[in-house]
């Protein structure tokens, strides 16, 4: 397996209330398929406000049959961020398609994939997501809860040719990042203990070698190896179900969602500084 690298291919407090999303089929006990056809992913488009104040559109899709959720958003600089939650495999996948700067010798765009363990309390179930509706699609949404920054040290490469063993979504989502798919040792260990073949994973470097490498922002020679940092944010996603009480019902019932924003910072090895030109020293 080649070292991961680039594959060339052509805050203020959030306002309340947030999104009045009708969970109509879910709340009213409608049969499966009412509001979203069985077997076809249900899509929700939401206008969201980014941390810098700019507005973009998110597309959220849920496939209750595959038990997965996907989110796509385009940043103002043109970067496309995609997120997949695969509940069946306990896997979440982040992909960034970063537009290149031709004047710096970069290709049209660069793709990165980060794969980590999914905890089921991070996001609402796919069946609930598939039944979300919104009353005012033109409204600009802002997350009710800002969750803390998560910093992740990605020290394992994922073998793209074997990636389907980890998640069936990986080979499609990370097709442009075949040599730049990263995960963590602790997550790889969790998946191998659950039966994923160890051939899916390969250490990037020995721990001592990574400690000795400088941050890419401190390296002037674009041909030198270094530790790259990449940050991304999920600006708005349904992280929890809300429950309401009623005199007419003996038990609490689902009546909406709570939305969250969460940021991630990944650090990982690159064989050349040229593959991490966005990472500049402050």
UniProtKB/Swiss-Prot annotation:
Stretch forming the signal peptide: 1-29
Keywords linked to the UniProt accession: Signal
KW Nucleus (keyword) present: no
Coiled-coil stretches noted in the UniProt entry, renumbered to this chain: none
Origin: domain of life: Eukaryota
UniProt similarity note: Belongs to the OAF family.
Designated name of the protein: Out at first protein homolog
Species the sequence originates in: Rattus norvegicus
């Amino acid at each position: 397996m080649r070292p991961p690298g680039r594959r060339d291919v052509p805050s203020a407090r959030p306002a309340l209330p947030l999104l009045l999303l009708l969970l109509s089929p879910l709340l009213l006990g409608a049969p499966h398929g009412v509001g979203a056809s069985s077997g076809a992913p249900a899509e929700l488009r939401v206008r969201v406000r980014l941390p810098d104040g700019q507005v973009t559109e998110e597309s959220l899709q849920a496939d209750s049959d595959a038990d997965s959720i996907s989110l796509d958003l385009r940043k103002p600089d043109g970067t496309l961020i995609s997120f997949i939650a695969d509940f069946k495999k306990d896997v979440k996948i982040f992909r960034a398609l970063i537009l290149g700067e031709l004047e710096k010798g970069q290709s049209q765009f660069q793709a990165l994939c980060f794969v980590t363990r999914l905890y089921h309390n991070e996001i609402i179930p796919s069946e609930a997501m598939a039944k979300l509706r919104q009353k005012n699609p033109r409204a600009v949404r802002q997350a009710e809860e800002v969750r803390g920054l998560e910093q992740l040290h990605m020290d394992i490469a994922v073998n793209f040719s074997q990636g389907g063993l980890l998640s069936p979504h990986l080979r499609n989502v990370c097709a442009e990042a075949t040599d730049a798919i990263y995960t963590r040792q602790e997550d790889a260990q969790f998946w191998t203990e659950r039966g994923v073949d160890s051939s899916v994973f390969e250490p990037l470097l020995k721990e001592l070698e990574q400690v000795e490498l400088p941050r890419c922002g401190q390296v002037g020679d674009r041909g030198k190896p270094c530790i790259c940092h990449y940050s991304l944010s999920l600006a708005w996603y349904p992280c929890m179900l809300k429950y309401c009480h009623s005199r007419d019902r003996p038990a609490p019932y689902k009546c909406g969602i709570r939305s969250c924003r969460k940021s991630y910072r990944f650090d990982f090895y690159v064989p050349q500084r040229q593959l991490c030109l966005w990472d500049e020293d402050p």
